[in-house]
Amino acid sequence: LDGGLDFETLALSCSAGCSGCCDRVGAACWSQASPRVVKGRFDSNSYPVPSRGSDGTSDVASLYQRMPPERGRPAPSLESQLAVTLPATAEQSRGTQMQLPALRNSYAQLPERFFAQTGPQPVSEPRLIRFNRPLAEELGLDADQFTSPDGVEMLAGSRFPEGLQPVALAYAGHQFGNFVPQLGDGRALLLGEVVDVNGIRRDIQLKGSGPTRFSRNGDGRAALGPVLREYVVSEAMAALGIPTTRTLAAVLTGDPVHREVRLPGAVLTRVAASHIRIGTFQYFAARHDTEGLKILADYAIERHFPQLSGQARRYRALLDAVVTAQADLVARWMLVGFIHGVMNTDNMAISGETIDYGPCAFMDAYDPGSVFSSIDRVGRYAYANQPRIAKWNLARLAETLLPLMSTDENEAVAEAEEVLRSFQPSYEAVLRRGFRRKLGLLTEAEADLQLAADFLDVLARGEADFTIGFRRLGDDLDASEGQGTARQLFRDPAAFDAWSVRWRERIASETADTATRRATMHAVNPKFIPRNHRIEAMIQAALGGDFTPFDEILRVVSHPFDEQPEMKGYADPPRPDERVLQTFCGT
């Protein structure tokens, strides 16, 4: 916007893949997502870190002077960190024992500056809303233990077994383009880790469990509404096949939280591959703590990308792996019309999972400029801007890794820029493959992406529903030209009819039978998404003590591709009086 682009132009140019404003070095313009990194100096909008020079900037060269990339204390191996068995049975003050499984915490074995240890904070009346038994089974956890009175108290953050090492993680981050050198888990606690049935290590974290050292005068609590929203949306994303954190449980605390009004308090139990964020790396870079950066990077490699451990240029390989994971993730968001709403660098996990469902939303009518977050006043995180912002965030990650990649600054910058340039082709490859399947195209043709783009244009001009539009294409495979249910979405179907002729000609060029094609389309075009008006109605009902809508929508979106005729109302778009125009973080 500071480059003279109005929002409408920016949204359209983002949608078209225009790179006209992407050539500035550093972070001077929030809208650019340059595959370049700051060289020699951190821009004042990028890293307002300690030890500033007279010109108001900070010298990145000092990051190199602190410690060469292959020296300093190495991070202990993940297995060695987990070698200590933590006892899980504790004698409590009321004379009972908490019989709960041991949760080991490898992150708590890192240096103390990585986190803040935090104990339990009692709540008045913890009450289980819902426990995710299928997920517990996947994690190898005993659901009966966690749903026992002792288990519910732990899930509320009210009591912990002896030996548990709950920690709040330190991190920094760019929030709407402005760098904050210390954020951290202000209302979350990492309880520990489990290894699931697939051999994957997963974090168990409480969200809304009370204040920590990073709360910044906040109450550290979560209201019921945002907890239920994250439960439903995260489980919907998992069912859609999109990498995401999961929800193990939701618990009422019995205590109120005060936002604009008095609301019931709740705690969410989040499961994640890890909680390492781009902002975690920024935290150490901002402090010129190259030793901390190296420990963090080595830990991240061993935890998420162990195949990189023996590589000579493993930090470049780490950046490359994160770039690839984020390109894949954001493309998948775009394919289902998901808008994260707050793509700050502290809300991007290096694991490639969707994390931090605050003011998130799914589009109803297709509009590339869709913004729902009440705090996103200029559309920084609009639907069409998401791939651009992801690139911008990854450039900030690359800046933190420069001193680890090479002792030669020019060489490090060149390597980082080369890796960042791979984002766009990786993103576009996933997008092309996804839209081809959404259109029922089983072979590749050069014009397929244009065919998809033209359908999106038809949807936009007709203000037609994104999810229903694609789903009905599969329903209409047997329909005659000029017939079918998809064209009923348009007041004037002429543009759709013209596009449909081209689409049917493309389909006719393939030999697949209709049943196979429809099955392919219905496997990627959901019938159900967690629509914003349904989420809002669910929250309002729960605030009144009725959790039936919560149970219903959770059941529906857990099977998004099934017809579920008895629940067909959940597939309908909102009436004009039901439309949700803004979503809120709840902090």
Language-model features: where?
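Periodic, rod-like helical contexts
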Residues: 13, 43, 50, 56-58
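Regulatory N- and C-terminal appendages and interdomain linkers associated
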Residues: 94-171, 372, 377-587
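Intrinsic-disorder-associated, low-complexity terminal segments enriched in Asp/Asn/His/Tyr and depleted
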Residues: 2, 6, 23, 43-47, ...
